[in-house]
């Protein structure tokens, strides 16, 4: 579980029986979705798919490919595992506002074209397209969330860099 899971899991655990799949020590099912189909033991009613690679600007082809390995192939591998134990009733996918490809505060709707062209955006678009088809074919309700910025304890990316900069005194106070 990454940043989102770290902040959401305590709340989910109070209401639901939660199983975590990932590569950290505290995950219930240890699997690198980018490289393998996880071995699931039970059927799940609802799946929250928040696995993803973000927070870096790729400098090499291998770094670009890593976005597709995690965000797209990881999604394909998760779905393959779910098929083995019975598909869920619903799947919630955490995507990103980057799929829209907007550089400025343009108003977007759900019908806005997906024009993101970074490896991160393209890999998330591919995952969304795969899930849309997979869920349609398997009669699974799909919800796609496209957050713009996630804030909270242990923030990563630009927000985390800004918080760390403030702690080190790199930003002046505005009063």
Listing of model-derived features with the role each one plays in the protein:
Residues 135-175:
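NAD(P)-dependent short-chain dehydrogenase/reductase
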Residues 66-74, 114, 118, 122-123:
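Glycine-rich NAD(P)-binding loop of the Rossmann-fold in SDR/ketoreductase-type enzymes
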Residues 19-38:
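Adenosine-cofactor binding site in Rossmann-like domains, unifying the SAM/SAH pocket
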Residues 33-70, 84, 99:
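NAD(P)H-binding glycine-rich loop region in Rossmannoid oxidoreductase-like domains
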Residues 1-14:
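N-terminal Rossmann NAD(P)H-binding glycine-rich loop of SDR-like oxidoreductase domains
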Residues 76-119, 135:
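Conserved Rossmann-fold NAD(P)-dependent oxidoreductase catalytic core, especially the SDR/UDP-sugar
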């Amino acid at each position: 579980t990454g940043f989102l899971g770290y902040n959401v899991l305590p709340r989910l655990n109070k209401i639901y029986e939660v199983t975590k799949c990932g590569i950290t020590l505290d995950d219930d099912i240890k699997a690198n979705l980018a490289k393998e189909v996880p071995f699931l033991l039970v059927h799940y009613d609802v799946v929250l798919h928040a696995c993803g690679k973000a927070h870096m600007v790729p400098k090499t082809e291998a770094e670009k490919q890593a976005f597709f390995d995690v965000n797209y192939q990881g999604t394909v591998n998760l779905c393959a595992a779910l098929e083995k134990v019975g598909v869920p009733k619903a799947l919630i996918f955490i995507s990103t506002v980057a799929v829209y490809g907007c550089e400025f505060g343009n108003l977007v709707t759900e019908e806005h074209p997906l024009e993101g062209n970074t490896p991160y955006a393209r890999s998330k678009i591919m995952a969304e397209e795969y899930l849309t088809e997979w869920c349609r074919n398997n009669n699974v309700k799909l919800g796609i969330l496209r957050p713009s910025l996630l804030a909270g304890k242990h923030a990563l990316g630009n927000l985390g860099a800004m918080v760390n900069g403030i702690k080190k005194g790199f930003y002046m106070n505005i009063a």
